[in-house]
Curated annotation (Swiss-Prot):
<dbReference type="InterPro" id="IPR035901">
    <property type="entry name" value="GIY-YIG_endonuc_sf"/>
</dbReference>
<dbReference type="InterPro" id="IPR000305">
    <property type="entry name" value="GIY-YIG_endonuc"/>
</dbReference>
<dbReference type="Pfam" id="PF08459">
    <property type="entry name" value="UvrC_RNaseH_dom"/>
</dbReference>
<dbReference type="GO" id="GO:0003677">
    <property type="term" value="F:DNA binding"/>
</dbReference>
<keyword id="KW-0267">Excision nuclease</keyword>
<dbReference type="GO" id="GO:0009380">
    <property type="term" value="C:excinuclease repair complex"/>
</dbReference>
<feature type="domain" description="GIY-YIG">
    <location>
        <begin position="13"/>
        <end position="91"/>
    </location>
</feature>
<dbReference type="InterPro" id="IPR036876">
    <property type="entry name" value="UVR_dom_sf"/>
</dbReference>
<keyword id="KW-0963">Cytoplasm</keyword>
<dbReference type="InterPro" id="IPR003583">
    <property type="entry name" value="Hlx-hairpin-Hlx_DNA-bd_motif"/>
</dbReference>
<dbReference type="InterPro" id="IPR010994">
    <property type="entry name" value="RuvA_2-like"/>
</dbReference>
<dbReference type="Pfam" id="PF14520">
    <property type="entry name" value="HHH_5"/>
</dbReference>
<keyword id="KW-0234">DNA repair</keyword>
<dbReference type="InterPro" id="IPR004791">
    <property type="entry name" value="UvrC"/>
</dbReference>
<dbReference type="GO" id="GO:0009432">
    <property type="term" value="P:SOS response"/>
</dbReference>
<feature type="domain" description="UVR">
    <location>
        <begin position="201"/>
        <end position="236"/>
    </location>
</feature>
<dbReference type="InterPro" id="IPR038476">
    <property type="entry name" value="UvrC_RNase_H_dom_sf"/>
</dbReference>
Length: 609
């Protein structure tokens, strides 16, 4: 029993952060306070009006505090602790991929491309975009409007003739001397930059001026080119939703909450245009106040620096924040410029907020339907297998090409569906090519021949294969020498029918020693197909990546003495990989940095392939 009176006697009145632990020593809640003593004392009053707080207090075994120099410092430390410990009584934003941006590189002939992750490449970044599809769509549009290269530098540096993009008018061909001058190319780059900045009218004004100049100089072909470009840009502008009011870059956050599930909709506005939106479904403890949810989400969302998010000038929310000022100060510090949080907006901002609220509600309805369907499928599978509960399932699959570059995948489902943070791939080696049984054995040993926490022990393990694969899996488990309960998982083989069609699978249930054929409309079968397909796609994705690596290294980089620089020199001077393969020994020797001995090694290696 936690002795609150004795603990509180030694707590300071200074600002800081507190961490609450349960009897297992796990952090169950992280909070901050202007006055640690006052805040912590409030948890141990006789009458607590919050069910969430009552539940939290009943699990407290110990509390640790950290004094900070200011409330702002406490706020930042709180979010760092929440991210590190993932406490169950805090609102948790599930870790998310970084946002994609459009990158305009800083080179003699800049290229325009998508970028995700840390901004190490020199150039200008535009975004963020809500997902990769929005970036691809924008890049495709830019390619039609402005003939700027989108190719990788490895392709650009080794061209001896213009590519197909030049032939169809989507690139001006800066890789080949004489096709476009540096000035003309830079002009198109400047137009693309203005377009991405939302300055469409400036682009049109410049192009109209260019068209008129070309016409006055009787260069009608050039004038016609600019005319077509103007028409294409006008057609795009007409389709875009643009606010007439001058708006700063801003993100709009709206929350919808129902039946224990919260949806936070983030709408991205840049230069008055809607770039897109994204839905988030944070883990929310029961009876959480929506203002607290909004406050925590804003902090976690913008303070995860590794995500590469740019903090906009304005953040609009649909709930009043208790610590709005502290958040503004912290976000301003992080952004290096003034950041405003607004919760009472009018005009176009109000329209955008309403749009975000509608999207949040629509996404929540879809999520609730999906959650209900998953629960129904779990219930059906529990009844089929006579299990009281299923909390965690894992599924294995093997992928290879003619026995080469073998990859095994393991995907994990919990009661909410795919748990992608726990997905794993395993490189399989040291087996006979094409031996799927040995591959499965190696994957299972890598996964389970180690200590496991109780919550990580699966209730069901699906093996994608027939009796042979399942029997090999059972042998592996029989030989495991581990401290956790290896008899807990129910191993099930999922065998495809003779026609290998979905809906004709047979379940081979190990502990019940029976085979089950389910009807195509069975909810239990749909859940099994879902996890099996996830495992299959995960394995194929890993295999393709490994195969591509092997392919790129099978030529030059696999040769001892040929690194990235020498490989680039060979490709550049001999006109690509095919040129290297067709080159004579003397031609290879003439490449700068390639000695006679290395040239002979390259020549002999490529001839023997």
């Amino acid at each position: 029993m936690f002795d609150a009176k004795n603990f509180l006697a030694n707590v300071t009145h200074q600002p800081g952060v507190y961490r609450m632990f349960d009897e297992k020593g796990q952090v169950i809640y992280v909070g901050k306070a202007k006055d640690l003593k006052k805040r912590l004392s409030s948890y141990f009053r006789t009458n607590l009006n919050s069910k969430k707080t009552s539940a939290l207090v009943s699990h407290i075994h110990s509390i640790e505090t950290t004094i900070t120099a200011s409330e702002t410092e406490a706020l930042l430390l709180e979010h760092n602790y929440i991210k590190a410990f993932q406490p169950r009584y805090n609102v948790l934003l599930r870790d998310d991929k970084s946002y994609p941006y459009i990158l305009l590189t800083k080179e003699r002939h800049p290229r325009i491309t998508s970028h995700r992750g840390s901004k190490k490449v020199q150039g200008e970044y535009f975004g963020p975009y809500p997902h990769a599809g929005a970036v691809r769509e924008t890049l495709s549009l830019l390619q039609k409007l402005f003939p700027i290269r989108q190719c990788e530098n490895s392709v650009y540096n080794n061209r001896s003739r213009p590519c197909l993009q030049y032939q169809i008018g989507r690139c001006s061909g800066p890789c080949i001397d004489g096709l476009v001058s540096d000035e003309e190319y830079q002009q198109q780059v400047d137009f693309a930059r203005l377009f991405l900045q939302g300055k469409d009218q400036q682009v049109l004004e410049h192009l109209i001026k260019k068209m008129e100049q070309a016409s006055m100089q009787l260069n009608f072909e050039q004038a016609a080119y600019f005319r077509d470009q103007i028409q294409a840009i006008r057609a795009v502008i007409e389709k875009q939703f643009v606010s007439n009011e001058r708006l700063d870059d801003m993100d709009i956050l709206a929350i919808a909450y129902q039946l224990g599930i919260a949806c936070v909709q983030v709408l991205f506005i840049r230069q008055g245009k809607v770039l897109g939106n994204r839905s988030y479904f944070p883990k929310v403890p029961a009876n959480t106040d929506l203002s607290e949810l909004t406050e925590t989400f804003v902090g976690q969302f913008y303070l995860q620096g590794h995500q590469g998010r740019i903090i906009p000038s304005t953040i609009i929310v649909d709930h009043v924040l208790n610590e709005k000022h502290e958040l503004e100060v912290l976000l301003t510090e992080q952004a290096g410029r003034k950041v405003n949080i607004q919760d009472n907006v009018k005009g176009n901002k109000s329209k955008f907020l309403h749009l975000a609220q509608m999207n949040a509600q629509a996404a929540l309805v879809t999520q609730l339907k999906q959650a209900n369907l998953i629960q129904e499928r779990y219930q059906a599978l529990q009844e089929l297998l006579s299990l009281t509960t299923i909390k965690r399932m894992e599924c294995f699959d093997i992928s290879h090409t003619m026995g080469e570059q073998t990859i095994a995948s393991c995907v994990v489902f919990d009661t909410e569906g795919p748990l992608k943070s726990d997905y794993r791939r395993f490189n399989i080696s040291g087996i006979t090519a094409g031996d799927d049984y040995a591959a499965m054995e190696q994957a299972l040993l890598k996964r389970y021949d180690r200590p496991l926490e109780n919550e990580k022990i699966p209730d069901i393990i699906f093996i994608d294969g027939g009796k042979g694969q399942l029997n090999r899996a059972l042998q592996v488990f029989a030989q495991l020498n581990v401290s956790w309960d290896k008899n807990k998982p129910l191993l099930i083989g999922v065998a495809k029918g003779v026609d290998r069609k979905a809906g004709l699978e047979t379940l081979i249930i190990s502990k019940q020693n029976k085979e089950v054929n389910l009807l195509p409309d069975s909810l239990a079968l749909h859940l099994i197909q879902h996890i099996r397909d996830e495992s299959h796609y995960h394995a194929i994705g890993g295999h393709r990546k490994k195969r591509q690596q092997a392919f790129t290294q099978s030529g030059l980089e696999a040769i001892k003495g040929v690194g990235a620089k020498r490989r680039q020199a060979l490709l550049k001077y001999l006109g690509g990989m095919q040129g290297v393969k067709n080159a004579t020994l003397a031609e290879i020797s003439s490449v700068p940095g390639i000695s006679a001995a290395l040239a002979e090694r390259i020549y002999e290696t490529l001839r023997s392939e």
